[in-house]
Amino acid sequence: GYDRAEILRRLRFVSPSSSFRAGYSYSNFGLTEGAVAAAKPTGKPWEEVAEEKLYRPLGMASTSSRHSDFIKHANRAELHAKIDGAWAAKVQRYPDAQAPAGGVSSTARDLSQWMRLVLGNGAYAGKTLIKADALDQTHIPLMVRGKNPVSGGEAFYGLGWNVEFGRHGPIWGHAGAFSAGARSLVMLFPEEKLGIVVIANAFPTGVPEGLSDSFADLVFDGTLGKDKVKAWNDIYAGMFGPVIAAAKATYAAPPSPASPAAPASAYAGRYFNDFFGDAIVSGEGDALVLKVGPAAARSYSLKHFDRDLFLTFPDAEMPDRPSAVSFAVGPDGKASAVTIDFLNDNHLGTLQRVGD
């Protein structure tokens, strides 16, 4: 719920996953920080610079980095996530804070013009929009990523691009997703001046990778090989299905006998850390409620599991996946800290009590 400036300020509290350019970690706000820095000398926001320098010169009239522009289109795709085995449009996503990395709305036609720019080494319709040597720097393999799990090609990361060397030659590409229900993928073959982009309003799905790999097989081999859509769908199912199943199994039933919770007053209070700010725990009726974000905007009901451990279900796109919220209760009978598992990916999910 925080705005872009506040999120970027708080990134200082996240420990780097590697030394500079020694490893790759997917980071929408890392890329956003770079975009903000690039736009700063112009005195204009990134959204305006992107429109002036990129979208407008390429004739991308249906492309914007503003969510408000996307909403204005009557003909737009709603995000879909698989819930109880069926695709459903349940979640609204407001990505403006990370617009440079994950907030662009577009069409297949518009994105084809962008691919022409990249494959043209920064030139489009006879005009140079990006210097070729600057664009070349982004395609240099800098970090090793291993092998592509389907094609077996050697995979690396450059500056905002996956760089792969497979049986069809060098490939520049990238994929992205929102678990709320969005997928995107681009795959470029620079030696053939050929590319494909796939945008999908669904998650999780390996269809974008499967389609692009099948496209490459048809172009280079004249025939389809193995079912690439199934191969990639299986990979995505393996990435997320077991995680959900493990969480459900862990908390399928409390231990027997379960220890009762302390009185609500033991847990109620205000908790804080530098990264997430305030979290408020309060008793509402017979239940505890956790509120986080600016002005305590997001609220999560807590269901008792065992002693000082509670469960909540924070994901609208995975409503049956439980997540733990645990309290550290001291000799005085008061919780001194709370650990919120769904905020703990960077080991920053523990907040200390700072008030009642």
Model region roles, listed by residue range:
Residues 149-151, 197-199, 203-217:
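Extracytoplasmic and endomembrane cell-envelope/extracellular-matrix remodeling and assembly machinery
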Residues 119, 168, 177-179, 201-204, ...:
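Short, glycine-/Ser/Thr-/acidic-enriched flexible segments
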Residues 60, 120, 124, 201-205, ...:
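Short, well-ordered loop/turn and helix-capping segments at boundaries between secondary-structure elements
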Residues 174, 184-201, 337-340:
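Short, well-ordered beta-strand elements
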Residues 209-356:
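Peripheral terminal and inter-domain segments
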